[in-house]
From Swiss-Prot:
Pfam family, one: Ppnp
Alphabetical UniProt keywords: Glycosyltransferase, Transferase
The enzyme's E.C. designation: 2.4.2.1, 2.4.2.2
Organism taxonomic ancestry: Bacteria, Pseudomonadati, Pseudomonadota, Gammaproteobacteria, Alteromonadales
Family recorded in the similarity comment: Belongs to the nucleoside phosphorylase PpnP family.
Species of provenance: Shewanella sp. (strain MR-7)
Role, per record: Catalyzes the phosphorolysis of diverse nucleosides, yielding D-ribose 1-phosphate and the respective free bases. Can use uridine, adenosine, guanosine, cytidine, thymidine, inosine and xanthosine as substrates. Also catalyzes the reverse reactions.
Designated gene of the protein: ppnP
A GO cellular component entry from the record: cytosol
The organism's place on the tree of life at top rank: Bacteria
GO molecular function annotation: guanosine phosphorylase activity; purine-nucleoside phosphorylase activity; thymidine phosphorylase activity; uridine phosphorylase activity
Catalytic activity: a purine D-ribonucleoside + phosphate = a purine nucleobase + alpha-D-ribose 1-phosphate; adenosine + phosphate = alpha-D-ribose 1-phosphate + adenine; cytidine + phosphate = cytosine + alpha-D-ribose 1-phosphate; guanosine + phosphate = alpha-D-ribose 1-phosphate + guanine
Protein name: Pyrimidine/purine nucleoside phosphorylase
C-alpha cells in the first residue's frame, strides 16, 4: 500500500452525484492539495477550475477527454492530465479510485 505521510486531511468528504462519487482533500505542508476519491459504477461529467493530473489508484475508468469523441481506458497506475476550465466524462462498471493532483 502506498502511503501519503505528514499531511492534513479534511474530515468532511466532498460528495457528488447523490453519493456515487466521494473524495477527501489532503493538504501538504507546502500548501499543495490532492484529493483521494472513490467512484461507484456509472457515468459522470466533471469540470476543472485548474489544471489536474488524475491517477487511477484502483480499478479502471473509461474517459472522454475534452475535444475528443473517443473514450480511452485508464487502468490502475495510469494517469491523464487536464487543463483548467474544461469538462470531461468518466464511466466505470466497477468501483474505482483515483488521486487528483492540482497543477
Amino acid at each position: 500500500m502506498e502511503l501519503i505521510e505528514q499531511v492534513s486531511v479534511a474530515k468532511k468528504a466532498n460528495i457528488y452525484f447523490e453519493g456515487k462519487v466521494a473524495s477527501r482533500s489532503v493538504f501538504f505542508s507546502d500548501g499543495s492539495k490532492q484529493t483521494l476519491g472513490v467512484v461507484l459504477p456509472g457515468e459522470y461529467e466533471f469540470s476543472t477550475s485548474q489544471g489536474e493530473i488524475m491517477q487511477v489508484t484502483s480499478g479502471s475508468f473509461e474517459v472522454l477527454l475534452p475535444d475528443s469523441t473517443t473514450w480511452q481506458t485508464f487502468s490502475e497506475g495510469s494517469q491523464f492530465e487536464l487543463v483548467a476550465n474544461v469538462s470531461f466524462k468518466i464511466r466505470n462498471s466497477a468501483i474505482a479510485e483515483y488521486c487528483c493532483s492540482y497543477l
